[in-house]
């Protein structure tokens, strides 16, 4: 007998934008389709609507761009992945993507990113910071326009 697929989504804040509502919808969709669904965010208005019987919600400061906080998030996400035996780590923004990327290396789990918007690639520092969104095992483009942007 196979076990349920366990998917962890990580997004900075769960507001009412397209990325956030998509994350919220996918979290509940996964449960409805025989998967275990986990969600890490730093809060937001949509968190009060999470069905806690369907989605395991964990609050962490994944909205932070502070490198020390991002490193702490890496450790905490790794512990969560090991504890719940998560199969896939799905990052939906750059700051948490760095923590998720490192956690995926530590835990040897699959890493997925979703590109929701365009990013400025002008400076070398920004280009490196943004590059995490393309370092995953699978990159999801939110639209054809975004797909063209990242090609």
Spell out what each predicted region is.
Residues 1-151:
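Membrane-interface segments of envelope glycosyltransferases acting on lipid-linked substrates or membrane lipids
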